[in-house]
């Protein structure tokens, strides 16, 4: 069991770049490449952003740049950069 119903609306990379630190976010797009150290370059139609996905948060998902994925996480902002700290990765069919 668990919750079924409306959750967070999907945001774009452009919107995520303007959000506040620690704001929950859902993004749908592709991972273009690994940047090392559990960081990845993620893109959608509006741009690219760095996503940090801990190994255990992949939940067995294997993705290539051709796969569309949904990432649930929080905005992680510091003085110079915005990235997404992922909690969950879902492979879209």
Annotate each predicted stretch with a short phrase.
Residues 1-93:
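OB-fold and OB-like single-stranded nucleic-acid-recognition modules
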């Amino acid at each position: 069991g668990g919750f079924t119903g409306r959750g967070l609306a999907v945001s774009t990379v452009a919107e995520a770049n303007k959000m506040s630190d620690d704001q929950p976010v859902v993004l749908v797009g592709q991972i273009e490449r690994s940047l090392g150290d559990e960081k990845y370059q993620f893109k959608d139609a509006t741009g690219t952003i760095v996503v940090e996905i801990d190994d255990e948060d992949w939940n067995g998902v294997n993705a290539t740049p051709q796969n569309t994925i949904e990432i649930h996480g929080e905005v992680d902002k510091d003085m110079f950069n915005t990235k997404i700290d992922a909690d969950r990765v879902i492979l879209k069919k």
